[in-house]
A protein has these predicted regions:
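Conserved aromatic-histidine-acidic binding/catalytic patches
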Residues: 1, 25, 83
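Hydrophobic membrane-targeting and insertion signals
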Residues: 1-19, 109
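Alpha-helical polar/charged "hotspots" used for coordination or helix-helix interfaces
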Residues: 5, 19-20, 40, 98
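An amphipathic alpha-helix signature
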Residues: 6-14, 30, 34, 38, ...
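Amphipathic alpha-helical interaction modules
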Residues: 21-68
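Amphipathic alpha-helical binding modules
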Residues: 72-110
Length: 110
């Protein structure tokens, strides 16, 4: 994505998740982050926010609720009922962090 720090994103997101209360081991946390980032990017491509190469197309096509639902759908595959509260907490922190970052770098404006 234009201007998006792909290499720095996992560490930035991990800090947000830890502040929100995520306590799992680093490898599990980063696996969650990788899956969430991939699902978020998939949503943005499907919504017309990004093109296939990752270039930013149209920020007006971004819908935060739809993005959250798409990421949740990808993350909850295979998750058991007991894992859902922690998953939802991490999803909320992930989306807050991502949207704030996209606004900060000027890709989104609400």
């Amino acid at each position: 994505m234009d201007g998006y720090d792909v290499k720095g994103a996992p560490a930035r997101i991990a800090k947000a998740l830890r502040r929100a209360g995520a306590r799992e081991p680093e490898d599990e946390l980063y696996a969650f982050i990788d899956r969430a980032m991939a699902a978020h990017e998939d949503y943005m491509r499907a919504a017309g926010v990004l093109d296939e190469s990752g270039a930013w197309l149209d920020a007006d096509m971004y819908d935060e609720d739809d993005a959250c639902e798409a990421v949740l759908a990808a993350l909850e595959e295979g998750a058991d009922e007991e894992a859902m509260p922690a998953l939802l907490m991490k999803l909320d922190a992930f989306m807050e962090c991502e949207v704030a970052y996209l606004e900060e770098i000027g890709l989104l404006a609400f």
